Amino acid sequence: HPLLGVELGWPELLARVQQSELLGFDSYWFSDHPLLNPDCWTRIAGLATTTRTIRLGTMVNCIYYRHPALLARMVSDVDGMSGGRVILGLGIGDFVPEFDQLGLPFPPTPVRQRALEEAIQILNGVWTDAPFTLEGETFRVRAAHIQPPPVQQPRVPILIAGAGEKVTLRQVAAFADASNFGPNPHTGNVLGSDAVRRKFAILARYCTQVHRPFASVLRTHWSPPVVLAETAASLRKKVAAITPDEHRFYGEHMVIGTAADAITHFQQLVDAGLQYFIVHTRADPETARILAEQVMPTLVPARQPLAL
């Protein structure tokens, strides 16, 4: 797909994820666009038994594409298959054509936001020891109970994507283990270090309201394509392969250059309070290697405390 990146066949994907594991990456993530890409959960299930240490996440699972009770069953099974390595990224969906293709209504944003809370209630509820019932606005379950539960307890870590200051960041504080946003419209439109700091100041206030330590939220970032090379010739070849659609969609947010360019880019975001980067490498092994060997070891934790 022109925007979702290079789609790898299974043998190529397995080799790429295993390479990422050997390079020391913490996790590998999959989008949830079932008519555009292979199913994220099928691929995670396959990787659960063919990798050993790397965590496997969704960036992000749309709550409308699978009923939350069914999703709870799938996540619990795959978490068990992987030995407790699943991260459940959740979102409310924003790609109207995909909803149309799947024959699904596209409710207004407030309805989808409330549905996210219902979905998390169901996930949490059916993973407990007792049957769980919820009569929600969007989702309903009656005396539902998932056994065996996930390996990770009390639940699989949940990430909520988005940067909305009135609702989404409040939901992160109330329900999630991790936040996530990025610089383009589909990932929160959070542009630059000052905007990142603003979002975290707001998130910190919501954490205070629910009596939760701000530090208990893992602050993650969805990074648009990163294209790195050791030589100018290699970089020119990679830049030439970037599609017009990618240029239009990601524009100046792409990180193109050397390890030094990437270090400067990511260190600024670390200094703004980000802790964890989910990086789109365009399935390029050299970019992944440069990130692992030259960029990641060089980044240092925030040099100054967040002004919250």
What is the predicted role of each segment?
Residues 1-308:
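Active-site-adjacent structural elements that line small-molecule/cofactor binding pockets in enzymes
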